[in-house]
Amino acid sequence: MVRRVASTDALQVRFWGTRGSTCASGPQYVEFGSHTPCVEVRCGERLFIFDAGSGLAALGAELGPTAPDKIDILLSHLHLDHISGLPFFKPALLGRERVIRTYCGNLEGESAMEPLNRLFAPPLFPVRLSQLPARFEHHGFHAGEPLIFDDGMRVETHLLNHPGGATGFRIGHRGRSVCYISDVEHSDLWPDPGLADFVHGTDLMIFDGMFSASEYAYCRGWGHSTWQKGVELAQGADVKSLAIFHLYPGHDDASLKASEAEMQAIMPTAFIARERQVVAFEPADREVAPARLEPALAQAGEH
């Protein structure tokens, strides 16, 4: 099998969990995966992790003892499907010098540190944060403020329409960018002007397309959207490619492939995210096309 390998300075995305609300299980869910949200983003060698759902455990197993000494995990919000992988993140159990930094918007005025401490405590979990070999640091912010890291990296943030609030993120590297827009419900005025401005021109938008258009009629107000609204936003904001994400756990491979075909007839650069799929963009100052693994090459185990 021949495929393009991204350079060491590419902006690279890898999906470790693509489901929403709960995991999916069974042979009919193999192609698109079973885990809840977790996305690895590499800016060259610099690692960022978006959300810490059950897919974080698989990412942690892959990183193992080679994980960086500092790991930044950006949480869109604290609903359980976005943090359930934290207690099982292998790098937190290895290496006493490692620092794991979590970032979450103070969406309802409360720091995320208190809920995370409740998660890492009996009766929910037998080990407290303070007892882990790695050291956890939490950084709160208000959605809309940029996050600026000690190495100069910068991540923009945006408040999303979701019960209790959620944060969208935009990260750039060498003229390329990715927007992570998980857990958002479209508004009556759509595309939302503020969100359209936030994602405008990005190379890849990862978007909450949990429900079909027919399902949404029964799920209005739950805080999620559809692939159709993702396409409308992408096309209205000059987004170059679209990954539909936060997939409903009841949608099996056959139904998702049918939806993907329908979507690609409207927007050929859109696709439904698959677990362990890799999308890479070379620096914009190079004459190299975006290196994306086609879905057939992005099955579980490919890396």
Residue ranges, per PLM feature:
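ATP-dependent carboxylate-amine ligase
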Residues: 302-303
